[in-house]
Amino acid sequence: MATTPLPNALSAYRLLLRATRIAFQGDFTTLHAARAEARKHFDQNRRLGVDTPKHIQHAVETAEILRTNVVQGVRVEGSGEAGKGEERYELRIHEHIERGDNDTIKTAGNKRIKAAVGKTCSQS
């Protein structure tokens, strides 16, 4: 079983910065905060140590999560039906977002779920 070699610290840092750019595109405040946090953690561990590969692996995994699992939403003004006070959000789903294939739904089979009669999900 072959394992992929870990990148060096600079490559991991660049990977993390690219992931923040993808995940937080259009949200300057969050993008700046995420990059500042990444820099802070890399600066704290500037010297090589025994746990350096662990920190690099953590940065690579964090970049992967940011790139594939973080979706941002923006509240859309004036949305919803008049008088109901519903809020609507527009999600920014980009090409890197991981999309599930609903295997859990397919394998659920004929399991019965108890639900309150007359209630919808938004009323709970």
UniProtKB/Swiss-Prot annotation:
The record, for Pfam families, names: Complex1_LYR (PF05347)
* Gene Ontology annotations of biological process type: mitochondrial respiratory chain complex III assembly
Q: Which UniProt keywords apply?
A: Chaperone, Mitochondrion, Transit peptide
Superkingdom of origin organism? Eukaryota
Describe its partners and assembly state: Interacts with RIP1.
Similarity section: Belongs to the complex I LYR family. MZM1 subfamily.
What the protein does comes down to: Assembly factor required for Rieske Fe-S protein RIP1 incorporation into the cytochrome b-c1 (CIII) complex. Functions as a chaperone, binding to this subunit within the mitochondrial matrix and stabilizing it prior to its translocation and insertion into the late CIII dimeric intermediate within the mitochondrial inner membrane. Modulates the mitochondrial matrix zinc pool.
Name this polypeptide is given: Mitochondrial zinc maintenance protein 1, mitochondrial
